[in-house]
Amino acid sequence: MKEIGLVENNYYFVQKSARKIGVEFRVGNHTISLENFEFYERMSEETNAFSADLVMNGKVVGDCSNSGRGGCADYHAYENRDLAREIATAVSEVEDYCFPKRKLTLEDVIDQLASFMIVLQENKVTTITKAKAVVKYLNEQAVKYRKMYA
């Protein structure tokens, strides 16, 4: 995979194949990403409704979803549970980008990955050039958001 750019603290856009752009979260030597991502706009009320395979270090370890009715993502690790536990612990050491006094949870990371996947899908991002433009825009927005809540 070719790295395209850092979107936000620990989130990277990556080129997965010739016409596929993805996003992954990195902490230490670990990566977290979503595969077979499906967004359900009609079911999204307070949060984004989605379902996906949860991938850690390149291996599908389970599935994740959000019903879209508020609250955080649900995930179920049905394989490599020790790896999932280890990565969840590593994630809990990372500060939230917008709220530095708060530590992240694996649910936060999954929801943010889903949000980035929706941006990629809705903007039909399939090229590195377009992905770089989206990275630039998202970084500008994140800086504005962080200043608002600083």
What do the predicted segments below correspond to?
Residues K2-A150:
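Terminal leader/tail segments of proteins
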